[in-house]
Amino acid sequence: MYEATDHGHGQLCIAATARYVPQTRVRPEVLVREPAATPTSVREAVMQSVYADTLRWRRQATAPVTVDHPSGRATMPARVTSESRLTLSEMASAVAREAVRRCHPNDNRAPDQIIVCANSFEDDLSLSCAGRLHSELGSPGVPFAIGQLQGVSFFLALQVAADMMASDERMHAALIVAAERWLPPFSRQTGTLTALGDGAAAVLVRRHAGPGWHVRSVTVCTPSSAVSIAPHETFVDEAAVVEVIGKTCAQAGLKPAALDWIVPPRINAALACEVSAQARLPAGRMWYPDPGDIGYLCAADAPAQLDLLSQSVAPADGQRILMWSAGFQGQAACAILEFRGS
């Protein structure tokens, strides 16, 4: 198992956030656009071939598995967000620019590093979202992306940004951008666990930025590559999540009662309640907007929730947020943020 922890006690500060959630809603089982029966170009033919190979590998790797986890017995959202106009990288670009603008209203300085989080494919496989943002914003750092960790992606990006700033005193700002757009032939449904929506969010973090949400502790755990998990086995490892939450609180030197907001992933409400109970988190402090009208934004979920929460509350000095998330094959992550007014 891989485990990464940062407990720099506020070395990293959330300087600005932004989110984009499409207005259009669709039923999760409906494919918005069917792939063309006959490819209209060589590029489209290559893309369809890659998609077909990916799906064929999943079918051949194992037979479908019914997983008896409490998290897998959820009420599915009736409708989810669907973006029909913007591509994945266009959504990412929009929230990235907005986060930079909010941090520097009169200054267009590029962040030192850009980290992109996504699990869905770009509309055109020849394009790179990370490369596009690097070019558009003029970041001096090497572009890179984190994928296939679902909701844990943002937390790993936060950890990476903290590690980079700790090892390079010339680095002062990093932009984390997460975006998802689910296109055929891939389904929006992850078994009976949840349904996936489209959307994007960005978080700009800085070193010692003054007032704002400071990162107290981050913990990320992923299963060892030696652990065999079938591709069809979609579940949340609740025990791993509870353990990660406990470690994060211990490393920050905090008891659950000292937390003011608990922000779980919007995978499903049953999972959120079950994990909170097992981790002995104060139930009355859970911040869980109804996911029924947007679905689960996957990699973009945590940063989108952070933006929504920061726009919805007026925190006092010393108040804290605990955010946790999970991947669909055993990954788990948690972070604690503390507000400092001066």
Go through the PLM ranges and name each one:
Residues 15, 117, 174-180, 205, ...:
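Short beta-strand segments
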Residues 183-186:
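Short, solvent-exposed loop/turn segments at secondary-structure junctions
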Residues 124-138, 172-181, 214-217, 272-283:
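Acidic-glycine-rich active-site phosphate/pyrophosphate-binding loop
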Residues 1-86, 188-247, 329, 336-342:
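Condensing-enzyme catalytic core mediating Claisen C-C bond formation in acyl metabolism
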Residues 121-122, 126, 140-142, 148-166, ...:
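Claisen-condensing/thiolase-fold acyl-transfer catalytic domains that form or cleave C-C bonds
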